[in-house]
């Protein structure tokens, strides 16, 4: 007769009318009983002949691929101009006084962050943008390319210009400025234009047709064409000094950017050298078709314009363009869907490539990528914006994988001890938290993303993919990529991106300048960074609490007025460090804080409402007597495991599921086991914070007997049959709790101390978890344990009762020291930004 749910409850001693604990509990440790119950509940029967179920509610299991959904309306999120202050340590010290060793060490880790992989695999550019959405390939290509461009403009990526140089936007850091090579350097010298151009390889104008043309003018100017020098001098508006524009005249195709030329330029002396203007000209940056502009170290923009297309000779005379897009302009349309129709929509398609404001030298970087990118929804609640997923999983795989640093994540009890209080709470949202932390340029060659350009991408996706040679293709090859699909897609995208279509159709290689999300190093660095900042804030405001986990920062204060003034001063402090907060997402929680999926109040901690709802839905959909694929079980256990500490029996109740996942077998829920779990999760009990106190109750056991010391009373008992020592110690602790009701129990057994009861016989683990819920344990060495003698059957000998103090732990969670009082170098009255004295009047 199968075990009914009522009977099972009684067996687990979850009902009040159970017999004396000393008799009932040891039975649950019996292997025979555990085996019989497992058979009754169908827990052990793992090899089943019925086909497995692969979907339960929203949980999918084996052999199911979740197809990501492409949204053609995705918006690219905007990124603020994030620049974390380089002297962050000094700024913190001005704010709070000398930093602790821990804080300094953590802040030095991220200024700048460094990345040392064991081995880097380079992938061809075709793999830069993953063909994740074959139906929307072109649309996805441009949206991703636009996202990358946005990141580059926000100073989050470097753009590879040549093998050894890169450009970026935003404010440079000192470790980026040291790399002077590759700038346009203005040197003041008395000789006037003698070495007007020094041609050194720098990669600023590499591969552009301007190179040879400028050279030819130099020869002319050396031959004494004076008017030329005059114009140069005027171009500098009278500054004496020779201009060094390091021009790289190579014809070798070092990949990275396609030439920015707009066709062949003859050696007319009018084009380049008279175009060296002051930075005022920057406004007309793209007035000509191709402009390569550079910010030089003295702040002048040096621009080399090619002649505008209007005066360019007809294409038939000159050589073929190397720009795939612009070649369509002069070719005959091959059909109604020829791309030349789109290219002829605009006269001026803008530059072929854009260059950043700053140029730096980088270690040798090949024209390859090290990870692919694709777009997904920003999060389940926000499907209008996209998020870029970067796959750098190569660094976590194989024998050469990087072992990422481990860091402490606060566990539930530590979190409760720390945050369960009667404070008012608010949480701050750090916008684009990962992109705050700068990476050293030496990491760039390992973290490359990019794309091979539209023609290669389209050719790779089309079934008739020929190996087209783009260097010297014929017009026929050019039209190979024309198709109705491409035409329609580009026409729609033209509405969104306009002339940017041209820029985005070129190949590009980008390296990360700030830490990317797809690398195991990033969460570690972010956790170090925010915990150090919170540590500083806690010391600046000793009467308040600041705590963070990754990019989630919470502030707590005694009253709402305190909290508001704390909020103002902390926000200003964070902004002064260059940390960007998202003011729209600041949440005020009142007295119950929502953090890391929990609700934490003065009464303790519970899971958030949306998780409780998910669990209810999960049980509603859970089939009975049908084998469920272990992958689905994994997902179910993930959800239930999060809320397990809030149930009567805790994790031990899920042990049968864990066992089936480990053996990769299907699991069949019997009606009784499902009803048992259902009841467990219907009534959730808060996890309360531990209180400090003196331990007065001690438990000890031998394999044959148990002993307790409760105050000055001593008790002992024997087991019917000898038990494993850990089991005996656990039973003794349960007896101590039920006899004395004490929340603090001294024990000398490390397994009992750890409060992980998953390795005990299943029924005993479940029952013990309920009996010992909310109990704190103190370690007492065996030699000093007052319960040691009674457990050996000696009641007459009294060891003196220990005074064992118990301090609740906050684990290794980034709280270094108890916050000291405000450092002494501040004025004695009160810190200017302190909300401590709301009604403070000057003396």
UniProtKB/Swiss-Prot annotation:
Disulfide bond annotation, renumbered to this chain: none
Record GO biological process: DNA replication; symbiont-mediated suppression of host innate immune response
Keyword Iron: no
Renumbered residue ranges of the record's region Disordered: 218-243, 290-316
Catalytic activity: DNA(n) + a 2'-deoxyribonucleoside 5'-triphosphate = DNA(n+1) + diphosphate; Endonucleolytic cleavage to 5'-phosphomonoester
Region (Terminal protein domain (TP)): 1-177
Record comment: activity regulation: Activated by host HSP70 and HSP40 in vitro to be able to bind the epsilon loop of the pgRNA. Because deletion of the RNase H region renders the protein partly chaperone-independent, the chaperones may be needed indirectly to relieve occlusion of the RNA-binding site by this domain. Inhibited by several reverse-transcriptase inhibitors: Lamivudine, Adefovir and Entecavir.
UniProt biased composition (Polar residues): 290-299
Domain spans labelled Reverse transcriptase: 357-600
Keyword vocabulary terms for this entry: DNA replication, DNA-binding, DNA-directed DNA polymerase, Endonuclease, Host-virus interaction, Hydrolase, Inhibition of host innate immune response by virus, Inhibition of host RLR pathway by virus, Magnesium, Metal-binding, Multifunctional enzyme, Nuclease, Nucleotidyltransferase, RNA-directed DNA polymerase, Transferase, Viral immunoevasion
EC number(s) from the headed UniProt entry: 2.7.7.7, 2.7.7.49, 3.1.26.4
Region of interest: Spacer: 178-346
Function in brief: Multifunctional enzyme that converts the viral RNA genome into dsDNA in viral cytoplasmic capsids. This enzyme displays a DNA polymerase activity that can copy either DNA or RNA templates, and a ribonuclease H (RNase H) activity that cleaves the RNA strand of RNA-DNA heteroduplexes in a partially processive 3'- to 5'-endonucleasic mode. Neo-synthesized pregenomic RNA (pgRNA) are encapsidated together with the P protein, and reverse-transcribed inside the nucleocapsid.
Remarks, miscellaneous: Hepadnaviral virions contain probably just one P protein molecule per particle.
PANTHER family documented for this protein: PEPTIDASE A2 DOMAIN-CONTAINING PROTEIN-RELATED (PTHR33064:SF29), POL PROTEIN (PTHR33064)
Family: Belongs to the hepadnaviridae P protein family.
Name of the protein in its database record: Protein P
Species lineage: Viruses, Riboviria, Pararnavirae, Artverviricota, Revtraviricetes
């Amino acid at each position: 007769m199968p075990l009914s749910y009522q009977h099972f409850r009684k067996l687990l001693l979850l009902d009040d009318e159970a017999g004396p604990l000393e008799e009932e509990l040891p039975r649950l440790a019996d292997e025979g009983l555990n085996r019989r119950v497992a058979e009754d509940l169908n827990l052990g029967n793992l090899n089943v002949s019925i086909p497995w179920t692969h979907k339960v509610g929203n949980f999918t299991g084996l052999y199911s691929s979740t197809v990501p959904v492409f949204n053609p309306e995705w918006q690219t999120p905007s990124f603020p101009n994030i620049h974390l202050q380089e002297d962050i340590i000094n700024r913190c010290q001005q704010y709070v006084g000398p930093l602790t060793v821990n804080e300094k060490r953590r802040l030095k880790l991220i200024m700048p962050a460094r990345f040392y992989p064991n081995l880097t695999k380079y992938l061809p550019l075709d793999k830069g943008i993953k063909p994740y959405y074959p139906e929307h390939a072109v649309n996805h290509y441009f949206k991703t390319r636009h996202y990358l461009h946005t990141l580059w403009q926000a100073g989050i990526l470097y753009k590879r210009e040549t093998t050894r140089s890169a450009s970026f936007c935003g404010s440079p850091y000192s470790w980026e400025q040291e790399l002077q090579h590759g700038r346009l350097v203005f040197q003041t010298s008395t000789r006037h234009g003698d070495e007007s151009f020094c041609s050194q390889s720098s990669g600023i104008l590499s591969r552009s047709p301007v190179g040879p043309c400028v050279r030819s003018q130099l020869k002319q100017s050396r031959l004494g064409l004076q008017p030329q020098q005059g114009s140069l001098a005027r171009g500098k508006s009278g500054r004496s000094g020779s201009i060094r524009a390091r021009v790289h005249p190579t014809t070798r195709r070092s990949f990275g950017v396609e030439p920015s030329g707009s066709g062949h330029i003859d050696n007319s002396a009018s084009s380049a050298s008279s175009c060296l203007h002051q930075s005022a000209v920057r406004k007309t940056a793209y007035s000509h078709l191709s402009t390569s502009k550079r910010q030089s170290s003295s702040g002048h923009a040096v621009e080399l314009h090619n002649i505008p297309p209007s005066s360019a000779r007809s294409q038939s005379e000159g050589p073929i363009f190397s720009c795939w897009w612009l070649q369509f302009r002069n070719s005959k349309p091959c059909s109604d869907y020829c791309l030349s129709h789109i290219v002829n929509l605009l006269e001026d398609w803008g530059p072929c490539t854009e260059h950043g404001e700053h140029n730096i030298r980088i270690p040798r970087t090949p024209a390859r990528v090290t990870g692919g990118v694709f777009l997904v929804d920003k999060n389940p609640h926000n499907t209008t914006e996209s998020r870029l997923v970067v796959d750098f999983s190569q660094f976590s795989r194989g024998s050469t994988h990087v072992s990422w640093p481990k860091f402490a994540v606060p566990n539930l009890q530590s979190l409760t001890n720390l945050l369960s209080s009667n404070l008012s709470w608010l949480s701050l949202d750090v916008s684009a938290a990962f992109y705050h932390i700068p990476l050293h340029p030496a990491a760039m060659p390992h973290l490359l993303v990019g794309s091979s350009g539209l023609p290669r991408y389209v050719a790779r996706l089309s079934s008739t993919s020929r190996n087209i040679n783009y260097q010297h293709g014929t017009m026929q090859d050019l039209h190979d990529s024309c198709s109705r699909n491409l035409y329609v897609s580009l026409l729609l995208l033209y509405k969104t991106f306009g002339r940017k279509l041209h820029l985005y159709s070129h190949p590009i290689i980008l390296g990360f300048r700030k830490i990317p999300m797809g690398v195991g190093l990033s969460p570690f660095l972010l956790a170090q960074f925010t915990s150090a900042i919170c540590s500083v804030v806690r010391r600046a405001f000793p009467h308040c609490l600041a705590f963070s986990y990754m990019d989630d920062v919470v502030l707590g204060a005694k009253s709402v007025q305190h909290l508001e003034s704390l909020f103002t001063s902390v926000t200003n402090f964070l902004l002064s460090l260059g940390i960007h907060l998202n003011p729209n997402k600041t949440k005020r929680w009142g007295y119950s804080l929502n953090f890391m999926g929990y609700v934490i109040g003065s009464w303790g901690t519970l899971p958030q409402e949306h998780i409780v709802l998910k669990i209810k839905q999960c049980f509603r959909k859970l089939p009975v007597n049908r084998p469920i694929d272990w992958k689905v079980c994994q997902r179910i256990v993930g959800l239930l495991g999060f809320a397990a500490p809030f149930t009567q029996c805790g994790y031990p109740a899920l042990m049968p599921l864990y066992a089936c996942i480990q053996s990769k077998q299907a699991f069949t829920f019997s009606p009784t086991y499902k009803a048992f779990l259902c009841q467990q999760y219907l009534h959730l009990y808060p996890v309360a914070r531990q209180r400090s106190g003196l331990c007065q109750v001690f438990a000890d056991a031998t394999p044959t007997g148990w002993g307790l010391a409760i105050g000055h009373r001593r008790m002992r008992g024997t087991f019917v049959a000898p038990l494993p020592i850990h089991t005996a110690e656990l039973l003794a602790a349960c007896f101590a709790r039920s006899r004395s009701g004490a929340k603090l129990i001294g024990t000398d057994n490390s397994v009992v101390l750890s409060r992980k009861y998953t390795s005990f016989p299943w029924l005993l683990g479940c029952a013990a978890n309920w009996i010992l819920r909310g109990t704190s344990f103190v370690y007492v060495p065996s030699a000093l344990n007052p319960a040691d003698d009674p457990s050996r059957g000696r009641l007459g000998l009294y060891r003196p009762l220990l005074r064992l103090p118990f301090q609740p732990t906050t684990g290794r969670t980034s709280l270094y020291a108890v916050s000291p009082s405000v450092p002494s170098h501040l004025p004695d009255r009160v810190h200017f930004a302190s909300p401590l004295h709301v009604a403070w009047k000057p003396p």
